[in-house]
Curated annotation (Swiss-Prot):
Protein name as annotated: Serine-rich and transmembrane domain-containing protein 1
Organism: Homo sapiens
Cell compartment(s), UniProt: Membrane
Pfam families reported for this sequence: SRTM1 (PF15872)
Entries under InterPro entries matching the protein: SERTM
Amino acid sequence: MSEPDTSSGFSGSVENGTFLELFPTSLSTSVDPSSGHLSNVYIYVSIFLSLLAFLLLLLIIALQRLKNIISSSSSYPEYPSDAGSSFTNLEVCSISSQRSTFSNLSS
């Protein structure tokens, strides 16, 4: 037990006063954070988050427009004075002009 075993990543030698001595393993030394891999991950995550925020903004705008369309269509009552008639103003004017033409022809 005079040589520390570096393959396990730590040594438990108590003779010289150290209880736990850590050594880098092959897995931790093979990953180099300065290689640019980590910066690529940050770029991809930032692109994903910005696209997600853009889609959320488009969804909010679409829901606002839909809310405005629904509220504007419900602000006009369904002609309560006409007893449930569903004629528009243009159709009512067209019918009244046809009646006046018919009354002029019949007299």
